[in-house]
Amino acid sequence: MSARLKVVHVGKFYPPYPGGMESHLATLCGELVDDVDLRVIVAHDGRETVSETVDGVPVLRIGTAAWISSATVNPGMAAAIRGSGADVVHLHHPNPTGVLSYLASGSRAPLVVTYHSDIVRQRVLRTLFWPVQHRFLRRAHAIIASSPDYAASSPVLRRHADRVRVIPFGIRPDDAGTPDPATVAMLRERYGARVVLAVGRLVYYKGFDYLVRAMDSVDGHLVIVGDGPMHRELERLAAEQGIAGRVTLAGRVDSVASHYAAADVFALPATARSEAFGLVQLEAMAAGLPVVNTQIPSGVPFVSRDGQTGLTVPPRDPAALAAALTRLLDDVGLRTRLGRAARERVSTEFSAERMARDTLALYHEAAGRPMPAIPTSRPE
């Protein structure tokens, strides 16, 4: 029997550090750790380098010497990649620090890249990084896109279309945790019987300002779980519209699962391609919630399909958002049917097990090794 592949993941950060890329990386590595010799190399938000094991996954957090805008400077990362002895390097992008460290490492291991999103808003960084990014992507054996929609709409991925493989992101059934019945009952009593839930960082591309405006004409209570720089702006907007009593900015919560269980409808009113996939949609769908999302050129409307698992409306359109939310809140039969289909779609199309299996096959292809037989289900 041949030795297991040694796979090194290079990311930005790793949980408990929050973020969509970080959540995906943890889910994927949690599924792969029994099938490959796995190690994760990421930045540490402190100056020291820390080696630890997180939920069975070996993680090396390289000390940060400085920050340039939102990017870290980690002088030890290139040496860590070079000394890893990897059979395959899997880098999660956009990640300027990881890309520069990989190129500086001189690694000759086959490269797999998960392309989480384009660099959208940081125009200076995008311009300066453009030639380096394409040099890096030309080195890749394969570039994973999370949806066919994003692969088709990204100018970067179109330039490297011959290397692009679509492997949708997946989740485990318990990724959001387990709802606590007492907490669910308390939330229902607090917010009432018509609850619209949104989850995410309070940043511009989530479109939460349009969602707050929409609630002016929706009979229901909006709960937004998450924090970020737009908190005060959203509070002010709700107050100006006279609906502060029906809009709750909950911040970070102990039990996201309980909030999903207490909600009737989930909303992701994204306005920009920075929202490349919308993993929170999967969590909501797994909880049996129909989704109201937006028709943006990314994976968002691919995850939850209009008329199948929810309703899709134009971006930046509070009236359309309000109409879709009201339709679902008023029609329990439609809400139940779409929610049931949403749960089934996650189970069949977006499982973490399926994502890991397809990724593992790609590793073996890149390394030129045959794919071993993998049990169809893992023992408990």
Question: Which residues fall in each region the model found?
Answer:
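N-terminal strand-loop element at the rim of the active site
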Residues: 5, 9-19, 23-70
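A conserved mid-protein helix/loop that constitutes part of the nucleotide-sugar donor-binding site
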Residues: 23, 27, 194-217, 229-235, ...
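Short His-centered aromatic/hydrophobic patch
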Residues: 91-98
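A short, active-site helix/loop in glycosyltransferases that binds the activated sugar's phosphate group
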Residues: 138-176
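Acidic donor-binding loop of glycosyltransferase active sites
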Residues: 141, 246, 261-276, 289
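Active-site donor-binding acidic/aromatic loop of nucleotide-activated sugar
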Residues: 230-233, 244-253, 259, 311-312
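Short hydrophobic beta-strand element within catalytic cores of glycosyltransferases
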Residues: 290-294, 304
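Conserved acidic donor-binding segment of nucleotide-sugar-dependent glycosyltransferases
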Residues: 305-307, 311-318, 326-333
